[in-house]
Amino acid sequence: MPTLLADAGAGSGDPDLGLLKAVNGLAADAPGWLDSLVAWTAEYGILFGLAAIGLVAWLGARRRPDAPVAVAGVLWAPLAVAVSELANLPISQLVDRPRPFVTHPELDVLVPGKEDTLSFVSDHSAMSMGVAVALFLVNRRLGLAAGALALLQGFCRLFVGVHYPTDVLGGYALATAVVLLLAPLAMAVLVPLCHALSRGALRPLVVARAAAADSGRRRQAAPAARRSGRRAGRDRSPEPERGSGSDLAA
């Protein structure tokens, strides 16, 4: 299939290739241990970090008053990543862009074995940004932390020489579009599902024990508060005024 994206090296002034070479060139001057660390981070480290943030988000969502809704939002993160990866399959075949080091052998490649795979869009970048955007809708602090890892992921993919900058940006855009555009449909399915799970044997996956206990105490306290309010209202009722006759008798 003909390549739809122009060859990134077609012109010496191509900013796509220029930025890639600038970042990848750092690897040539870096010590071997740093190259190995960045390569591991680019392939696995960022994903482990995002998984840890997702776990923290899930634990926090279970303790919220709207736990089923919050947990549904967290659950949408990995599902959105899966949808993004499926959407990328036809996109990558349509664009048919080879890895940058295939057409530019002068690049310093730190992650071998990707010669037969396509470059656009970056799967790792799409996965990272998909998690970040989905978590941001549930917890802004954790979403921003995941977003920082997603940006670091993009830098690492350039550092190891396996993607062009536009591959990374394409991954970011694809994941963001999937998360935001499909979120209403996903939540329409996931929220009722999480509510149903919260009423069954899998309730601990959706609602933490402390949150469940607090909710139960609030439900028990509400009728008591209403009864107490009614009694207080009766106690505050005005006393009947004494007649003038009693005053004269005094």
Identify the meaning behind each predicted range.
Residues M1-L50, N88-E115, A201-A210, R236, ...:
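N-terminal transmembrane-helix/juxtamembrane module of multi-pass inner/ER membrane proteins
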Residues V111-R219:
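Membrane-embedded catalytic cores of phosphoryl/pyrophosphoryl-handling enzymes
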Residues P2-L4, G11-D16, A70, V74, ...:
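Multi-pass membrane proteins that catalyze or facilitate reactions on polyprenyl-/lipid-phosphate substrates
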Residues A42-A61, H124:
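Hydrophobic alpha-helical transmembrane segments
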Residues A28-S36, P65, V69, G73, ...:
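Membrane-helix interfacial "entry" motifs
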Residues V81, E85-L89, Q93, T176-P184:
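Transmembrane alpha-helical segments of multi-pass membrane transport proteins and ion-pumping complexes
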Residues P65-A72, F101, N139-A145:
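Membrane-helix interface segments
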Residues V56-A87:
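Interfacial segments of alpha-helical transmembrane regions
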